[in-house]
Amino acid sequence: MTISTTALGGGATTATRKQVEAKYEEERQIQLQSRGMVEDIEITRNASFEQFAKDPWAAPKQVDVEIQRERLLQQAHHKIIIIGAGFGGLLFAVRLIQTGKFKADDIILVDSAAGFGGTWYWNRYPGLMCDTESYIYMPLLEETGYMPRNKYASGNEIREHAERIAEKYALSERAIFRTVVQSLDWEEEGKVWKIAGVKLGKNDECQQPFQLIADFPIMASGAFASPRVPNYPNIFDYKGKLFHTARWDYKYTGGSIENPKMSGLADKRVAIIGTGATAIQIVPQLAKNSRELFVFQRTPAAVDVRNNYPTDPARFKSEIQGDGPGWQRRRQINFNAFTCNEKTLPTDNKIGDGWTRMPSFSVLIGGPQSLEPDYIDQIRPIDMARQSEIRSRVHKLVESTAIADSLTPWYPGWCKRPCFHDEYLQSFNSSNVQLVDIRHDGISRFTPNGLVANGVEYELDAIILSTGYTVPVTRASPSGRANITVTGRRGVTMEEKWANGLATLHGVMTRDLPNLFFAGTSQAGACVNLTYALDQNAIHVAHILSEAVKRQPSDCTKLVIQPTHEGEEAWTMEILQRAAGFRGIAGCTPGYLNGYGMDASSLKPEEQMNMARLAAWGEGIASYVDALEGWRSEGQLEGVEMTFFA
């Protein structure tokens, strides 16, 4: 179907809208038919793909890291062990320390990386920036007194901020790096968790087993821990350079994250597979530095203006910090109000970016109006108008009509993470850049000299995989995402709880996995600004743990805490009552946000109910936080079962 790319301007008719919806469905069907042709490999579970998981940033001789690791491992029993040393893990640690009931010495952070930062440790590709305003994304700016250098900070600056937080709260010496947790097992007799895994040696080899004991483990390993690598036919026949964007090889490309002048590509034919939020930042850099660049695209990104600029210290002090103590949280709440499409919006849009001008993203993350039966019908015309502007922008910036047509996104704006960049689309005007549209046939196979797509062999010196991260559809629990086996009372595993009718209390703890806490989206709040959601989880867990410790009798040495059955079922009912707020995702083009096009209507009723129990809080992040703060203010720890042992 061919229709105007500018369809749905201000005076769009119902007929035009139906045309656009038909075009959306046509593109969706094309995507559904091409999906599933290539299996995704979890690289940590497949020895043939281990090269894509190795750490390129770990120094060959990190003596200080090794000494610190061995010292902490020798202290086998720790009060709190946090799995993950990104912003999630750091926020849990900081909020626990701020209660006054825990010290840094009570806490250990364990991570497979060789430093702090989580996804910002691993990702160091050229052009990397956050796509949410740094003044609200980078946590604890008030506490650290730090001013980001730009409205959208670079990846390097964000990683350095993680290190800054660790230093301020005396956590730098409380991390066990290059250590992979593989299992958590509850020991009923000792009322502790046994944590087992392996220490990584040089080049991630020489793996040695370890075991730790924790009173209270916290799982904060994040959703983007493992690079996603499609198992293309004959992928290992390829003799050129092959790497994933999350393991960028500057030794091959030249340059660095601080200086993306990649002189090593000046005489190279380079391919990048994927055009999501990562690729749109990399493509302009590759276009400037490669002899030839081939961009393999299945689904076009919807790319709006980013408009990054340096932070003006005077303005930052007067307009942003000038709002007084608590300015960062108020700014975050202001952002959330617009992105969740609150019924009554603030009079002042403090951020004023592409996110806050996209109320339709609330279809994905939830909001107060999402629960209204006709909300999708209300928001669809607004989203169609925005997507029309996005499509028009493509044709304004891209000189070739044919290339612009291929770069034009035909799907609702909430179906893919929206992108923001000021150079990506213009890159396709360069004579050395070629777009390869693979939405029909995909990549059929690799060859020794390149790959075959659409029946054409492309000879390539390097192939870069910008294929995202493993987000398991069937292993959606925190343990599944982290590839950790968690076994609680009576042999109950976390995976079983998520698969067979999840119930939690507030999305941070679940019965039969006592003393264990976690971060995630199931039965918790969701928002664009991930660090805000993580912080709310951390604040809540810190409250629960500190209040429980306060109530522990002086003659008791052990505390066991878990939700009551009634408490977690009551919370789950609150989730189910709001699950319909996410119904708009079902008709999207396939991707990780909708289980790669999974048809829920084909499932049995009990399977559909189990899926609904996995949903986030559908009324928006503000409502979720209000529910948690109201619960805390009552001071009863309602729905929590505490048992004390001498």
Swiss-Prot record:
It catalyses: preaustinoid A + AH2 + O2 = preaustinoid A1 + A + H2O. Pathway: Secondary metabolite biosynthesis; terpenoid biosynthesis. The record marks 417 as: Transition state stabilizer. The lineage of its organism: Eukaryota, Fungi, Dikarya, Ascomycota, Pezizomycotina. It comes from Penicillium brasilianum. Glycans are attached at residues 46, 429, 483, 529. It is an enzyme of class 1 (oxidoreductase). Belongs to the FAD-binding monooxygenase family. Its cofactor is FAD. Its EC number is 1.14.13.-. Binds 1 FAD per subunit. The chain crosses the membrane at residues 80-97. The gene is prhK. This is FAD-binding monooxygenase prhK. Keywords: FAD, Flavoprotein, Glycoprotein, Membrane, Monooxygenase, NADP, Oxidoreductase, Transmembrane, Transmembrane helix. Its main location: membrane.
